[in-house]
UniProtKB/Swiss-Prot annotation:
This is Indole-3-glycerol phosphate synthase. InterPro entries: Aldolase_TIM, Indole-3-glycerol_P_synth, Indole-3-glycerol_P_synth_dom, Indole-3-GlycerolPSynthase_CS, RibuloseP-bd_barrel. The gene is trpC. One of its GO terms (molecular function) is phosphoribosylanthranilate isomerase activity. The lineage of its organism: Bacteria, Pseudomonadati, Rhodothermota, Rhodothermia, Rhodothermales. It comes from Salinibacter ruber (strain DSM 13855 / M31). It catalyses: 1-(2-carboxyphenylamino)-1-deoxy-D-ribulose 5-phosphate + H(+) = (1S,2R)-1-C-(indol-3-yl)glycerol 3-phosphate + CO2 + H2O. Transmembrane segments: none annotated. The keyword Lyase applies. It comes from the Bacteria. Pathway: Amino-acid biosynthesis; L-tryptophan biosynthesis; L-tryptophan from chorismate: step 4/5. HAMAP family: IGPS_B. One of its GO terms (biological process) is L-tryptophan biosynthetic process. Its EC number is 4.1.1.48.
Length: 270
């Protein structure tokens, strides 16, 4: 079995357990569920230039613990102060040491920046969970879903007011997508079966996608020259996690990466 298969199996068990512990009716009574309208991820990515989705992540299967001590709310506040277009929050507990509580803590401290629940969404129950802890958007991984599941989850998320970042890795994943449904597409440079990284994967995949869909490159991004290449190729946003998590001050690292990219772009244009 691949790493992705292991994670999906574990997620399936966790979801069934949480359904028993916290019914959907109880989730819908939580303050974040209906006291605020979710923010639009697509709108956040329309700002001029390359948008940054900054990630809050303690660990990963490929790297182990990345940041310790780990204060999710403080990190997210730094990102917001340094103009992240959106903030991605890992909530998967067994392989990434994430938690739904991290999202709720961050929402309480960062009210005006879109929050993306980054997890392995396989059940509509997880969408209600996301809304209940203050998420504005969810990640839907096409590799982990069949076309029917992907369409069903996307429709259910939209009905709840949540944006979707639909993620692909392989060209075959594109065949699963209803392009009338999807407004933001992410391409993961990391193979979720092996966790190996190919930084050119985004460029290859985006070259085959329709115009008008928001484009987000994900994983393995830390070099400003690569970011400039992506922007020139029509990419709207980048999702960056490990590079920022390893910095002493993640927010400052975000601003520095953005500034270095702009400097390189200006030099190439001039």
């Amino acid at each position: 079995m691949s790493i992705l298969d292991d994670i999906i199996d574990d997620t399936r068990e966790l979801v069934e357990q949480r359904k028993q512990e916290t019914p959907t009716s109880e989730l819908k009574e939580r303050p974040f569920y209906d006291e605020r309208e979710p923010l639009s991820l697509a709108e956040a990515l329309k700002e001029r230039g390359l948008s940054f989705i900054a990630e809050v992540k303690k660990a990963s299967p490929s790297k182990g613990v990345i940041r310790d001590p780990f204060d999710p709310a403080a990190i997210a506040q730094q990102y917001a102060e340094h103009d992240a277009a959106a903030i991605s929050v890992l909530t998967e507990p067994l392989h990434f040491e994430g938690a739904l509580e991290h999202m709720a803590w961050i929402r309480a401290h960062v009210p005006e920046t879109p929050l993306l629940r980054k997890d392995f969404i396989i059940d509509p129950y997880q969408l209600v969970e996301a809304r209940a802890v203050g998420a504005d958007a969810v990640l839907l991984i096409a590799t982990a879903l069949d076309p029917g599941q992907l369409a069903e989850l996307h429709a259910a998320a939209t009905e709840l007011g949540l944006s979707c970042l639909v993620e692909v890795y392989e060209e075959e994943d594109l065949d699963k997508i209803d392009w009338e449904q999807v407004s933001v597409l992410g391409v993961n440079n990391r193979d979720l079966h092996t966790f190996e990284v190919d930084l050119d994967n985004s460029l290859r995949i985006f070259d085959q996608t329709p115009k008008g869909v928001g484009r987000v490159a994900e994983s393995g991004l830390s070099d400003p020259e690569t970011l400039v290449r992506l922007r020139k190729a029509g990419v709207n946003g980048v999702l960056i996690g490990e590079h920022l998590m390893r910095a002493e001050h993640p927010g400052e690292a975000l601003s520095r990466l953005r500034a270095e990219g702009k400097k390189i772009a200006a030099q190439q244009a001039g």
